[in-house]
């Protein structure tokens, strides 16, 4: 059963974050939030996706995650990359990447929710930039995995609480391209 949640960032903290990152003062009316509690997906992959989409516009993030679902573009892995394959990457910087399809689908649903929240507040969807995205561990769903000879091993399923905060920014400070520098081959 989902627990009560309050966003980890207040509107004042979001405004301060936007001022530090972009040098623009915004009001609480220019902020849109979305929250997805207790999602059954990988916490580690959720952190990587949240880190990657922070700073993108809403349309850029949706386009990139749709390509992840189609296995056309990967998400660079920065933290949890021990024993991961290093690819001859078509981008500069991070040779370790994954295609977290399940996580990308859940984030696409959340971005759709965020876009609807922004439109409800009267924000221009083309100027909405993701300023904060976070994935927090949720509660564990107890499960049992049957083993040989009548034994059983506890195998808990993890859940993730995901929140995304976006703000409507002036056109001058909106990022124009993705973070990965794609190499033409």
Swiss-Prot record:
- Keywords, alphabetical: Ribonucleoprotein, Ribosomal protein, RNA-binding, rRNA-binding
A UniProt-annotated Pfam family: Ribosomal_L22
Keyword rRNA-binding in annotation: yes
Q: Which InterPro entries match?
A: Ribosomal_uL22, Ribosomal_uL22_euk/arc, Ribosomal_uL22_sf
Signal peptide position in this chain?
none
One GO biological process term = cytoplasmic translation
Task: Fetch the CDD domains from UniProt.
Answer: Ribosomal_L22
A single Gene Ontology CC term: cytosolic large ribosomal subunit
Q: Which GO terms describe its molecular function?
A: rRNA binding; structural constituent of ribosome
Q: Which cysteines are joined by disulfide bonds?
A: none
Quaternary structure per UniProt?
A: Part of the 50S ribosomal subunit.
**Protein function:** This protein binds specifically to 23S rRNA. It makes multiple contacts with different domains of the 23S rRNA in the assembled 50S subunit and ribosome. The globular domain of the protein is located near the polypeptide exit tunnel on the outside of the subunit, while an extended beta-hairpin is found that lines the wall of the exit tunnel in the center of the 70S ribosome.
HAMAP family associated with the record: Ribosomal_uL22_A
Q: Which family does it belong to?
A: Belongs to the universal ribosomal protein uL22 family.
Q: What is this protein called?
A: Large ribosomal subunit protein uL22
Native organism taxonomy: Archaea, Thermoproteota, Thermoprotei, Thermoproteales, Thermoproteaceae
